[in-house]
Regions:
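Flavin (primarily FAD) cofactor-binding/catalytic cores of flavoenzymes
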Residues: 1-70, 118, 122-184, 188-425
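Dinucleotide-binding Rossmann-like beta1-alpha1 core, especially the glycine-rich loop
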Residues: 82-98, 109-137
């Protein structure tokens, strides 16, 4: 046996040695009509979702489901809308393995390419990372839910061959889309940036250590807001590999100080107007990033007015100055939504809803949105959920302790049956 087969045998041995999976300990609370319900539903089966499921099972919380609207292999961005050739993160970082050496990317890579192959590897290819995540899921036997779904639209970049493309924005995803269009044969790609120059330093790289990962969510509001507003003004640069990917194409042009004054589409293409005047393109790619706004999440519509946002925690002028941060949900230490009014009828329901992802970044920092933090974030989430489940069922656990009867001295001459113990004491 060699290669991945040997590694998978090692994984099985490691998990057995770790007593995985442990027995399920939550007692479960049935629905009002008596039907059983899940202890945890994880919505999203990408990197964080599957790792959260694994962390819950590792903690003995097994009555769970992990669901995703995508088909297998299309969860998350890796095989769908991500365009970068390689990950931003260094190859040595861990996370989805939850501290099990045989489940690390390095173990998976070396099983196929040897130690020399690991030394030759510069950074992890995006699709290799996807293949690794799927392997981890299967090797750890932790696929805990069926996947349902229609995928995010996949752009056919082949349509851009010979075309003129405008890209609005100069962040990492903008460069990745520009590079993909150029490699697909686009004749000309013009990128427009509002800034006078590209950001130079990725400040979040200075936050990747255990103290920050574990401690940020427990800081007071003022200190967290200070970090948040500083990093909001210090945009992250695109990786140098993404920039060079575009620069090697003669049809690429990056224009600074170029705010769009107007954009108009017609049957023949798109007209973009800047201070330089109107320019014609065949298509436009918006690389402007994403926003976190609970008001636009239909699944949270019933809780929209009851949930607390960061804008409720800071001075009105601060909220007005940083509207993106102010819109973010204000989460508790266990990633749970918190109520504006603790006496609200929805307060209890909000405590059962936990957000692990970009929406949690304002409350928990990079613990909720990056490869280096996935292991810490998911184990923290599992621990907090376990504490909440235990507290909710503590009365029944007390009764179970009282009823627990596993006589240690039964094989000895000093064994006393329960009924005699009661009479004597």
């Amino acid at each position: 046996m060699s290669g991945l087969a040997a590694l998978e045998a090692e994984v099985r041995r490691d998990l057995v040695r770790l007593n995985h999976p442990p027995a399920n300990w939550p007692l479960g609370i049935p629905a009002a009509d008596g039907t059983p319900v899940l202890d945890v539903l994880v919505v999203g089966g990408g990197m964080f979702g599957q790792t959260a499921g694994f962390a819950l099972i590792r903690d003995g919380i097994r009555n769970i489901r992990v669901i995703d609207r995508a088909r297998r292999g299309e969860e998350g961005p890796w095989g769908t809308y991500a365009r970068m050739p390689t990950l931003r993160s260094p190859k040595h970082l861990t996370g989805p393995d939850l501290g099990i050496p045989s489940l690390t990317f390095r173990a998976w890579w070396e099983a196929q390419h040897g130690a020399e192959g690991w030394e030759r590897l510069y950074k992890i290819h995006r699709l290799d990372w996807l293949a690794y995540l799927l392997w981890v899921r299967d090797a750890a036997a932790r696929a805990t839910g069926r996947v349902f779904h229609s995928v995010d639209p996949v752009v056919d970049f082949g349509r851009f061959r010979g075309r003129r493309i405008a890209v609005l924005g100069a962040n990492a995803s903008a460069f990745d889309n520009a590079g993909t269009a150029l490699e697909a044969g686009a004749a000309k790609v013009t990128m427009f940036a509002r800034r006078a120059f590209l950001p130079q330093v990725n400040k979040t790289r200075g936050m990747v250590f255990s103290g920050f990962l574990r401690g940020f969510g427990r800081l007071d509001d003022a200190t967290r807001w200070r970090f948040l507003t500083y990093t909001a003004g210090e945009a992250s640069p695109p990786p140098h590999e993404s920039v060079l990917r575009c620069e090697r194409h003669p049809g690429f042009r990056l224009v600074f100080n170029a705010r769009w004054r107007d954009v108009a589409a017609d049957a023949e293409g798109v007209t973009v107007t800047t201070a330089e005047g109107p320019q014609r393109f065949d298509a436009v790619i918006f690389g402007t990033g994403f926003t976190v706004d609970p008001a636009r999440m239909p699944e949270l519509a019933a809780f929209r007015d009851a949930m607390q946002l960061w804008g409720d925690r800071v001075a009105p002028e601060e909220a007005a100055r940083y509207p993106e941060l102010a819109r973010a949900p204000y989460l508790g230490e266990g990633f749970e939504l918190t109520p504006r009014d603790p006496a609200s009828l929805l307060a209890g329901a909000l405590a059962r809803l936990r957000l692990l992802g970009p929406a949690a970044a304002s409350s928990h920092g990079i613990l909720s949105g990056d490869i280096p933090a996935v292991g810490t974030g998911c184990t923290t989430l599992a621990r907090e959920i376990g504490q909440a489940l235990f507290a909710e069922e503590v009365g029944r656990h007390y009764d179970a302790v009282v009823a627990f009867e596993e006589p240690e001295l039964a094989p000895t001459p000093y064994f006393v049956p329960p009924e005699q113990r009661l009479r004597r004491g």
